[in-house]
């Protein structure tokens, strides 16, 4: 919602939308950030107060960074944690580690794609390529296609999944096909 308001303010020049977006962002940062992670949703209790739930997902964390509501400067510890500790096979689970928060793992669309986008933004080309292989290689071996989910439980020939080609081209050549004006990555 925050990013939508910002985009509408930019595209249509509607006064007040940018300010409304900033209020939404401030509210989320103040009320949805609990114990070092963002909760997925806030609800009204019986008194009418808005309170956080106990729903924590890997995807919610990626949404906050992908849409720039939070960033690697405002939430450095969480940002580093999400790129380096979570999102790797079953590592979203606590693995018996009582210090590590249990997050519901991301599915392919949208969570995994946002994760890959964040790796690309950070110019982590080697890790990006490794994760593309880890996420997509088995799919291509089993069906010759890319899937909607992490498993073959739904569409096993999802057109949107071809978006992974952008990540692979970037990982191999340092070139972003969507933004060629940026030139080649430095690393």
Please provide the spans of the model-predicted regions:
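Active-site core of glycosidic bond-cleaving carbohydrate-active enzymes
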Residues: 2-187
